[in-house]
Every structure is written in structure tokens, then in C-alpha cells.
């Protein structure tokens, strides 16, 4: 691979940023970060281990260097190619493409796992896609009200049958006056 802008320079003295800049300038179009790394590795004749050791530093440099611009999806370009207004539009356009791709993928439904293994205690409110409650669903069940009244009447009848022991004894109940306590508070 030849980069014309770097001809005549010693390869061992070139930084990865210089090679990336010259590479993008020569190609004239944006590139994936992985493509940039492969091209730099080929041009500088570095081993995989050398590239792995310097990739984090290079990524930091490409982010902080003012001449590069990330366009999203790990695509990089030279800032000089874009007017300031156009940069925002380019990034927004790439974001919209990402959103469209995400919308096309069907959403995965996650199965809820019961950690206790008891399937009888499923909460119906946790179910997805439950229908909304309408006024008809909220109508009162008059039969249930009648059953409740019958239960109360039966309970009252049972209480009436119970004989109370020592009903005539008086029980002393002490009542504390709370009004005196409110005057004793300190206000600082």
C-alpha cells in the first residue's frame, strides 16, 4: 500500500495519527475505524501484538485530535471535509439509519423467571398486553355485597351468643392529656 503524502519519510518515524490522516486524505471518503487500523498496520508493517498494544492510545488520539470527526457507527472522516452545519446533518443522518435498522428487528420478548419456582403466585399485573379496565369491569357485584352482609350478620349473632365473664367488674383506664405536652417544646 502506498500513501503518496508520506513518500520520502521514514516509516519508523511516522505516528499512527499521521498515517491515518494521510490515509483518509488519499481515499477522500470516510472509513470504518477497523479499516483505518488495518491500513495503518499494513503501511507501518506492525505486528498484531504491536497494534493491540497501541490501539487504545491511537483511539484516544483520534478522538482528541481536532482534524478527525466521528460520524457514528465507528465511522471516521476528516473534519476539513465538512462545513460546520453539514457535520451535524451527517451525524444525524447516520443516527437515523441506525434507528431504522433497530426498528426493523423484531423485539425479543423476555420470559419472566420465577426465582422461587412457584407458578401459582403469578401476578396478573405483571403480564404484558393486559387489557385496560373499563367501567363495565369495575361494576360492583351485588351478589358479593349480599354475601358480605350475611357474613356480618352471622358474626354478630355469634358475638351475641358468647357470654362475657365478669361483666360487672369495673376497669380503671388511665387517660393521658396530650395538650400539656405541646406547650413544653423548645423553639430555638
From Swiss-Prot:
InterPro entries: Asxl_HARE-HTH, RNAP_delta_N_dom_sf, RpoE
Organism: Lactococcus lactis subsp. cremoris (strain MG1363)
Disulfide bonds: none
Membership in a protein family: Belongs to the RpoE family.
Residue segments, region Disordered: 96-188
Amino acid composition bias (Acidic residues), ranges on this chain: 118-150, 158-188
GO molecular function, one term: DNA-directed RNA polymerase activity
Domain HTH HARE-type: 14-81
Protein name as it appears in the record: Probable DNA-directed RNA polymerase subunit delta
GO CC annotations on file: DNA-directed RNA polymerase complex
GO biological process, one term: DNA-templated transcription
Role of this protein: Participates in both the initiation and recycling phases of transcription. In the presence of the delta subunit, RNAP displays an increased specificity of transcription, a decreased affinity for nucleic acids, and an increased efficiency of RNA synthesis because of enhanced recycling.
Subunit field text: RNAP is composed of a core of 2 alpha, a beta and a beta' subunits. The core is associated with a delta subunit and one of several sigma factors.
PROSITE patterns reported in the protein's UniProt record: HTH_HARE
Record keywords: DNA-directed RNA polymerase, Nucleotidyltransferase, Transcription, Transferase
